[in-house]
Amino acid sequence: MKLVYLVLGAVALLLLGGPDSVLSSSSGNLHTFVGCAVREFTFMAKKPGCRGLRITTDACWGRCETWEKPILEPPYIEAYHRVCTYNETRQVTVKLPNCAPGVDPFYTYPMAVRCDCGACSTATTECETI
């Protein structure tokens, strides 16, 4: 019964404030948020022979459930690692300013449409291990 009230409360919050109110920029929500969401991101697009251009786009952001536990048989550990990764993207092309003659002024980058927690894929995500 308590789960029903929790779900109804979340739906009411979404209806009253929209999805941005749930994942707002207030530090409290961002520090406790577990999951993967599309969020605004700003970076400097650069290319040799052109001036840089500050771009604001959508990117994937979040924390996903991950755990490891020891087991008695090799490899002696069971691991479950998920990362916030791109599920769907759209390619966006912009024209960089003041490019030198002969330099292609166009710069293409991915914009996140949908993000999910999943296994890290080097095709869409920079996967690093320590």
Swiss-Prot record:
It comes from Mus musculus (Mouse). Expressed in the anterior lobe of pituitary. Functions as a heterodimeric glycoprotein hormone with GPHA2 able to bind and activate the thyroid-stimulating hormone receptor (TSHR), leading to increased cAMP production. Plays a central role in controlling thyroid cell metabolism. N-glycosylated. This is Glycoprotein hormone beta-5. InterPro entries: Cystine-knot_cytokine (IPR029034), Glyco_hormone_CN (IPR006208), Gonadotropin_bsu (IPR001545). The keyword Secreted applies. Disulfide bonds join C36-C84, C50-C99, C60-C115, C64-C117, C120-C127. Gene3D superfamilies: Cystine-knot cytokines.
